[in-house]
């Protein structure tokens, strides 16, 4: 066993979810590579007399189920796991896929039904709102290949980003949170991007190892009807096992009225047509993890890239709620560092970030070199 899993499990139990005696915790492993960490979490949960429950989801089994399932089957599957989740006080989800095509051959229609009747019910409505939760990946050959690293090299990277000094990060985030809470107008200018929106009256929140590992975000949400202009994202992103790049959104009064993504424009618009809320924004956040510099086409890592922000179509964050509701929540990242084209972010006409670096004195501790 990799001894670093012991430290990671400890951080998850005591820092991320603050598990207590007699609490039910669901440890869910999606892909069997994550069992080593899951077993360590269960071991440490038992030490404090919590009640761990293990659920293993095999990607191939899920794929076969969805291919053959009726809409009613998917509805019943969601109801069953919803009832299980209602009994939990805590949740840790470990994802360890072995392929980019884990759900290959599943139709877009079935994936949309799964998102609507399973993901939205079990996770967005119950797990996110009513449990102490944290989700993470597990370092395996698949993630190493995606990152163009050796397995050992990726493991070293992984444990660095997951076990960063989150207490230091938490303190450094406070001035940004306070500034966002006082800000009305946000203006973002970058290649292919000229976007304005208001965050007035929407609470901001710090994320420092509590919901995601790796972590590092300060997030809020635009006032629902305030987004105007256009944005062109400069990272690849995956949704429903489809990889998108060069996504551009055009907004009028909060709504995405035009969406393009090279040859995947049709698929992009099908996702945005999931429901009315999918064409409105549910999150605006800064990525702040000092060890994550480049995209992996994996949201859990990419949304934490230092010198980046993400603007998220779909369901609003509970902590920063603008009232938008949707079955989707899709964090799409734009990196503002100079090597990615640069860019500027203004709060109430004051420049706060240029080329991925905070320039206000009170925010400079959040720059990558100061968080390591």
Predicted regions and their residues:
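Oxyanion-binding "anion nests"
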Residues: 217-260
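Short aromatic-centered micro-motifs
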Residues: 188, 250, 345
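Active-site lining segments that contact anionic ligands and/or coordinate catalytic metals
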Residues: 228, 244-246, 253, 279-283, ...
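Active-site bordering "gate/hinge" segments
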Residues: 1-229, 366-371
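Short, glycine-/Ser/Thr-/acidic-enriched flexible segments
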Residues: 32-33, 97-99, 140, 202, ...
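Internal helix-turn-beta structural module
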Residues: 296-371
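Dual-mode signal for accessory low-complexity, basic/Gly-rich regions
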Residues: 258-325
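A short, compositionally biased
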Residues: 179-185, 243-245, 336-344
């Amino acid at each position: 066993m990799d001894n670093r899993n012991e430290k990671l499990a400890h951080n998850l139990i005591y820092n991320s979810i603050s598990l207590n005696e007699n609490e039910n915790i669901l440890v869910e492993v999606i892909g069997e590579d994550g069992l080593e960490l899951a077993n360590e979490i269960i071991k440490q949960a038992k030490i404090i007399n919590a009640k761990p429950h293990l659920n293993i989801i095999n990607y191939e089994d899920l794929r076969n189920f969805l291919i053959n399932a009726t809409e009613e089957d998917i509805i019943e599957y969601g109801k069953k796991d919803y009832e299980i989740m209602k009994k939990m006080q805590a949740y840790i989800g470990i994802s360890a896929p072995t392929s980019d095509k884990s759900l290959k051959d599943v139709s877009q229609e079935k994936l949309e039904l799964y998102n609507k009747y399973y993901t939205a019910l079990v996770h967005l409505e119950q797990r996110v709102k009513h449990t102490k939760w944290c989700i993470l990946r597990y370092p395996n050959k698949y993630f190493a290949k995606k990152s163009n690293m050796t397995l050992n090299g990726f493991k070293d990277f992984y444990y660095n980003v997951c076990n960063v000094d989150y207490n230091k990060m938490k303190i450094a985030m406070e001035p940004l949170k306070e500034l966002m809470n006082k800000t009305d107008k946000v203006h973002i200018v970058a290649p292919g991007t000229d976007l304005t929106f208001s965050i007035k009256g929407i609470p901001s929140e710090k994320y420092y190892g509590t919901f995601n590992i790796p972590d590092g975000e300060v997030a809020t949400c635009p006032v629902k009807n305030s987004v105007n202009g256009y944005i062109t994202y400069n990272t690849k992103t995956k949704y429903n096992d489809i990889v998108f790049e060069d996504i551009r959104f055009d907004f009028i009064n909060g709504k995405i009225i035009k969406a393009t993504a090279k040859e995947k424009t049709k698929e992009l618009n099908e996702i945005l047509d999931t429901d009315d809320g999918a064409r409105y924004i549910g999150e605006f956040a800064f990525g702040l993890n000092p060890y994550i510099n480049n995209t992996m086409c994996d949201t859990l890592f990419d949304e934490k890239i230092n010198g980046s922000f993400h603007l998220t179509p779909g369901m609003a964050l509970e902590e920063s709620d603008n009232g938008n509701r949707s079955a989707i929540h899709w964090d799409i990242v734009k990196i503002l560092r100079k090597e990615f084209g640069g860019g500027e972010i203004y709060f109430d006409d004051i420049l706060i970030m240029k080329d991925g670096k905070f320039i206000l004195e009170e925010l400079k501790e959040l720059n990558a070199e100061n968080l390591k």
